[in-house]
Each structure stands twice: as C-alpha cells, then as structure tokens.
C-alpha cells in the first residue's frame, strides 16, 4: 500500500519546530455526494452545487477532479478504507467489507502516520459508533479520538440525519479547542445525504427540480447536495480567515442508488440494466476537492482513485512521501 512506506518513519527535526510547519488537514467524506452530470446532460431550475462548480473552474490554491471509487449506492466503509490505508478493494474478494472482516490489529494508515508526526487525529461521524465497526477500527488506524452521534449535542437535523452544517460546526469546534501549535487531522464522515430519498419531512423541502423529469428521489437528492455544497463553502470560508496553515479535502463516498440515477440515464438514452462497461464506470465517479489557505499549485481535471488520494493530500501538505 502507498501508505506503508510512511509508517514508522523517524522525524529527525526538532519536534516543536516541525509541528509548526505542518498544516492542519481537514477531510470531509460526504455521504452519497456526487455530480450526476457525469452520467449525462440534464437541466435544473438552479445549480445544485454552485460553490463546488466554482472551485472546478480554476480557483486559486485548489485541486479538483473526479475520484474513482469501488462502490455505488452504499458500502461507505470501503471508500473510507481505500482513502485511509492506500489499499485498493481490487485486491480483495468481491463483496468484502475490510472494516468488518480484515482489520483486527493496527495497520499502516494515514492517521497513524500523521500521529507519528505529532498530529492530533480525530475521526467524527454523526451516527452510531458501531456502524461498520468504526468504534473498533478507528483506533487501529491511528485515530486518538472518535466522536459519534452521542457527542453531537444540539445538532441540527435535515430529514432524520445530522446536517452537514452541524458537521462543519463540529470541525470548527475541534479546531478552536485544539492545543495551539499542534497540527490537527480531522476525518469527518457525514450522514445528511444518506438514502432513501422518497419520504417527506417537516424539516426539509426539496427545491431543486429537473426539466422533463418528475422524480421525488432525484429532486430530494439534488436538494440535499445543494445543502452539502453550502456547508463546504462555509467550511472553506472559515479557514480562509484563520492564521494556521490548513488544507481542506472534500469528496463523496459513492453515487446514490439506481432510483436516483435512473431518470438521468433515461434522459440520455440509457437504463440502469443496459449500461455498457464504459457507461457503468461513470457510476463510480465522484468529485473531489483539495483546497489550501496557502500557496499550492492549482489544477483542475486531475482524476485519481480513492486509494491514491491520501498520497496527493500529503504532497500538497508538504509532507514527505518517501
């Protein structure tokens, strides 16, 4: 795995001096976040992710592209596994869930490596601790603290899940209470956009519609994505104003289920059951953003895979990769 070479490296510089050079690394893996435009053209009454689209159009100190993931419509934990360990699901049996089957002891991973450099490493997920065995797995990957739903006091909800806006509030809270001079690594897995998308709710009214399509799930999904886009803008806007060097990474774990995607495919002469191999690959693409509040080489259209993304993050963070 790419990250194995990072494990156990000796840091021969003065630790306090080194810590100050290291940027905070804030990672948001956003539940079901994707840009369905990769599947084909469609027209909405308003842009469903205007902020992310603006970042893709050549924003300063920003790297954007599409991430190839190994899951579609579910199995979030596998994208987590690929990002955090640098391992690929391609080398594991079909149907595997590494969190539940293979991680039984400490293994080389991004949080463990960052912890060895002096980072405070925090995983946060506003749902139940035992989901995908995260409460057991996170410490084995090197997280010093794990925060779950029971610690999201006073959080706002969208439908029946903690909102992305409240996830951003939690990240800001973690940053503001951290030890000064100690770099912070936060890995946030959101819940707001979790399927299904057919029920109605008193606390959420979908407002994005697709021309020529009547689909409650699609409208609800795109409206949720719009809220995620607003939360991303809030997160980056906050760190634009902070003094400490900080890098923000944002990506989706997978596309939504076929119920959401089918109308877009149908508009473009496809169905979920008749996709060619190349068309099916499009169902495994999600957008990603790497943004920094300091100078990095901006790049758009830089496509990669979930298991390579952490190495890119370390590169832009100025952390040795060999």
Give the positions of each predicted feature.
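Solvent-exposed soluble domains appended to multi-pass membrane proteins
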Residues: 5-23, 27-30, 34-322
């Amino acid at each position: 795995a790419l990250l194995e070479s990072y494990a156990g490296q000796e840091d021969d510089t003065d630790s306090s001096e080194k810590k100050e050079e290291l940027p905070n690394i804030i990672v948001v893996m956003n539940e079901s976040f994707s840009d369905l435009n990769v599947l084909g053209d469609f027209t909405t009454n308003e842009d469903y992710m205007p902020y992310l689209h603006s970042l893709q159009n050549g924003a300063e100190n920003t790297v954007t592209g599409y991430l190839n993931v190994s899951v579609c419509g579910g199995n979030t934990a596998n994208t987590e596994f690929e990002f955090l360990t640098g391992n690929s699901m391609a080398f594991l049996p079909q149907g595997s869930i590494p969190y539940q089957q293979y991680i039984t002891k400490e293994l080389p991973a991004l949080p463990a490596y960052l912890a060895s450099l002096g980072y405070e490493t925090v995983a946060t997920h506003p749902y139940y601790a035992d989901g995908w065995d995260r409460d057991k797995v996170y410490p084995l990957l090197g997280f010093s603290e794990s925060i779950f739903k029971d610690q999201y006091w006073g959080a706002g909800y969208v439908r029946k899940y903690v909102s992305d806006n409240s996830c951003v509030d939690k990240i800001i809270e973690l940053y503001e209470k951290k030890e000064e001079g100690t770099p912070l690594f936060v890995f946030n897995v959101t819940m707001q956009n979790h399927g299904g998308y057919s029920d109605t709710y008193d606390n959420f009214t979908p407002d994005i519609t697709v021309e020529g399509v009547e689909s409650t799930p699609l409208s609800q999904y795109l409206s949720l994505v719009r809220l995620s886009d607003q939360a991303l803008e809030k997160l980056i806007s906050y760190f634009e104003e902070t003094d400490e060097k900080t890098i923000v990474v944002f990506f989706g774990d997978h596309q939504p289920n076929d119920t959401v995607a089918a109308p877009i495919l149908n508009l473009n002469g496809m169905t979920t059951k008749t996709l060619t191999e190349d068309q099916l690959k499009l169902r495994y693409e999600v957008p990603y953003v790497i943004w920094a509040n300091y100078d990095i080489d901006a790049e758009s259209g830089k496509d990669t895979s979930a298991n390579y993304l952490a190495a890119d993050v370390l590169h832009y963070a100025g952390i040795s990769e060999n």
